[in-house]
Design a protein with these regions (language model features):
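Solvent-exposed coil/turn segments that connect beta secondary-structure elements
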Residues: 63-66, 102-103, 113-115, 122-125, ...
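Extracytoplasmic/secreted cell-surface and envelope-processing proteins
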Residues: 70, 106-108, 127-129
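Ligand-binding "clamshell"
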Residues: 112, 125-146
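Alpha-to-beta junction loops
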Residues: 58, 93-94, 111-120
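Intrinsically disordered, low-complexity regions
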Residues: 32, 66, 114-117, 134-136
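Short helices/loops that flank or line small-molecule/ion binding pockets
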Residues: 90, 99-116
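N-terminal hydrophobic or amphipathic helices and topogenic motifs
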Residues: 2-98, 130, 147-154, 158-169
Length: 169
């Protein structure tokens, strides 16, 4: 009976101990701070154009739709996607498509450095983004990249020509 009581006390102690929020700063043996994965992903830096080329991948975010991106017999389709694919080919990199729920999610991903380009016609109102590449003058909308990524914005502006639309459509 005494053993059962001791066992129960130990189990309860372990249970309560495991439920406490452990916010201690952890350090490596050589003194650097260990940042939890969730915090380090928040501080991801924007990849420069050179980083994108050396990594061999451009990450585009967009919404699912007939003009943006859709899957047709295991092939990507949609005007925004096809244009971005053309840009990725010009850079000599592959294109990864990340479909987002809404424009807010796309903007967050680009600001956090989780994506390189918003291949979607965004209103040019957010000052933390750089608007570049394919745009529609009548609606004052354009693709966007992180404001810090000037080289990518310039490359997109140098690449896009309105005549491309006729070739893709």
């Amino acid at each position: 009976s005494n053993n059962k009581l001791t066992f129960l006390a130990i189990v309860l102690l372990l249970l309560f101990h495991s439920c406490t929020n452990n916010n201690q700063v952890k350090t490596t043996p050589w003194g650097t701070t260990i940042v939890p994965e969730s915090e380090s992903s928040q501080k991801k830096s924007t990849l420069s154009l050179d980083d994108i080329v050396s990594n061999g991948e451009l990450i585009m975010v967009t919404l699912s739709g007939p003009d943006t991106y859709y899957d047709y017999h295991n092939s990507g389709m949609g005007l925004q996607y096809l244009l971005c694919q053309n840009f990725a080919e010009k850079l000599g990199v592959s294109l990864r498509v990340d479909i987002c729920r809404d424009t807010t999610e796309m903007i967050k991903k680009v600001k956090r450095g989780e994506a390189d380009v918003i291949a979607f016609q965004l209103p040019t109102t957010d000052r933390q983004l750089s608007y570049c590449g394919f745009g529609i003058d009548s609606t004052k909308t354009k693709w966007a990249v992180n404001r810090k990524n000037l080289a990518l914005a310039k490359a997109l502006n140098d690449w896009f020509k309105p005549s491309m639309l006729a070739q893709i459509r």
